[in-house]
């Protein structure tokens, strides 16, 4: 089973439900496209096309700074293997120039806010090293969703900062059911340092019928002893233009 993501504009949506009933949501629209293969490799092009929303509102305060700096990364051209492994940033010099210039502007604007300056400096260090930056991209939820169906059985999905910050869950999807238009996946086992009492998962993929997909949705519920249930929902859905 191998499928590429269908080119176009997509909405990326992320949501976390906590045991106390609180939730956190994040969404943004991006454009996704591929170049033709060259020696087996292709370039995945990701470009931002709309504003981000956090809990249904435009980013404020520190979130605004994170959004401001993060948006400068686009367009991002990533050379990938046939199985979806990121190999290099084709336009790395261009990306770094934009990112470092904007980072300096932000630090100058917020020079009296040491936490913001420290955050920007940390981000600059991460992006300056292409290998470290490439690793960060490869572990991002949005990238992992894009390339998941290129090698379902071979991909190990890493879900970071869940159920808590600096926690990480690693797992693989298996195909539970399939027909001409849909693919249903599940997660039989999760690897993590945190003890989970139970977990429930399901993923839905909509096929276009042309060896591509244009919608993927994943829901994971984990139970922690003494805490209760944490739910994570991720979705990447094409917008009809």
Predicted regions and their residues:
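A glycine-biased structural micro-motif
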Residues: 66-81, 85, 92-97, 101-104
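Solvent-exposed helix/loop surface patches that form functional interfaces
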Residues: 87-184
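Acidic, serine/threonine-rich low-complexity disordered tracts
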Residues: 1-80, 144-241
């Amino acid at each position: 089973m191998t499928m590429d993501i269908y080119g176009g504009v997509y909405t990326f949506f992320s949501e976390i439900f906590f045991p106390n009933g609180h939730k956190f949501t994040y969404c943004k629209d991006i454009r996704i496209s591929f170049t033709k293969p060259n020696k087996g490799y292709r370039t995945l092009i990701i470009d931002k096309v709309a504003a981000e929303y956090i809990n249904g509102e435009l980013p404020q305060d520190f979130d605004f700074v994170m959004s401001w700096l993060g948006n400068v990364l686009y367009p991002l051209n990533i050379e990938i293997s046939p199985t979806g492994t990121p190999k290099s940033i084709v336009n790395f010099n261009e990306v770094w120039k934009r990112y470092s210039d904007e980072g300096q502007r932000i630090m100058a604007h917020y020079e009296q806010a040491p936490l913001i300056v420290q955050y920007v400096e940390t981000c600059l260090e991460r992006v300056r090293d292409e290998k470290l930056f490439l690793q960060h991209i490869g572990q991002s939820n949005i990238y992992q969703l894009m390339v998941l169906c290129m090698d379902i059985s071979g991909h190990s999905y890493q879900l970071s900062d869940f159920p808590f910050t600096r926690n990480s869950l690693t797992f693989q999807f298996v195909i539970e059911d399939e027909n001409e238009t849909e693919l249903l996946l599940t997660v039989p086992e999760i690897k993590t340092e945190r003890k989970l009492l139970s977990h429930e998962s399901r993923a839905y993929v909509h096929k276009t019928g042309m060896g591509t997909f244009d919608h993927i949705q994943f829901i994971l519920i984990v139970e922690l002893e003494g805490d209760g249930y944490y739910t994570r929902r991720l979705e990447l859905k094409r917008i009809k233009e």
